[in-house]
């Protein structure tokens, strides 16, 4: 499972910064205040921290049914939480159903103005594309996998999402040697 719970903390931090920026002389003081309040537990009742706890519980659950229960609790708390939807889709047994559900999820999302891993709001969209690419790759549908991976390739220059190895496999499977070489060079630069 891709670990994205830290993004919830980043969302909380971003919200805190936007609300309190004018109150501080320096960004360092602002961040220090945020961290002090975070460490003191001042944010424990926020939606972001509740979501984090539910994601962790879902990840640590002993059964699929228990995990599903936690993901559904996440969606009850925050119906637009894309990553909970992704995780529920992953539990579906048939890959064609997973692909259909992921395609519907992608279509329901607002495409990011810029595909960039450094933009937190773009990451769920990019993860959906990676999920689809992985299913296509599993069924040797290499060109479809490449089509899913390509926008992420352009938006995740340092391979934070860890998909470059899979894109190389897709390029080799599709006998797309030139693109595969470029992906391999990027992979070497990231390591």
Question: Where are the predicted features?
Answer:
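N-terminal alpha-helical interaction modules that lie
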Residues: 1-112, 136-155
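Structural signature of alpha-solenoid helical repeat junctions
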Residues: 49, 80, 117-124, 159
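"A position-specific structural signal for the A-helix of alpha-solenoid helical repeats
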Residues: 49-56, 87, 131, 165-169, ...
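TPR alpha-solenoid repeat register
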Residues: 84, 128, 161-163
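Extended HEAT/HEAT-like alpha-solenoid repeat tracts in very large eukaryotic scaffold/adaptor proteins
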Residues: 120-134
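Short, structured loop/turn "capping" segments at alpha-beta junctions
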Residues: 143-146, 159-161, 178-181
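Preference for long, well-ordered alpha-helical segments
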Residues: 151-152, 156-162, 166-169
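Long, repeat-rich segments with strong aromatic
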Residues: 163-191
């Amino acid at each position: 499972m891709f670990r994205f719970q830290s993004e919830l903390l980043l969302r909380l931090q971003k919200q805190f910064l936007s609300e309190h920026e004018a109150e501080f002389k320096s960004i360092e003081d602002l961040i220090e205040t945020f961290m002090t309040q975070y460490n003191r537990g001042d944010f424990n009742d926020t939606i972001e921290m509740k979501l984090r706890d539910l994601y962790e519980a879902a990840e640590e659950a002993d059964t699929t049914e228990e995990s599903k229960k936690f993901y559904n609790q996440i969606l009850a708390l925050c119906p637009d939480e894309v990553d909970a939807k992704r995780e529920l889709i992953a539990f579906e047994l048939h890959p064609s159903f997973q692909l259909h559900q992921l395609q519907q999820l992608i279509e329901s999302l607002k495409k990011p103005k810029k595909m960039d891993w450094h933009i937190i709001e773009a990451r769920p969209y990019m993860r959906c594309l990676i999920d689809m690419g992985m299913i296509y790759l599993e069924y040797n549908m290499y060109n479809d996998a490449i089509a899913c991976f390509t926008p992420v390739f352009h938006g995740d220059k340092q391979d934070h999402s860890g998909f470059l190895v899979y894109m190389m496999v897709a390029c080799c499977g599709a006998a797309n040697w030139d693109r595969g070489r470029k992906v391999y060079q990027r992979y070497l630069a990231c390591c």
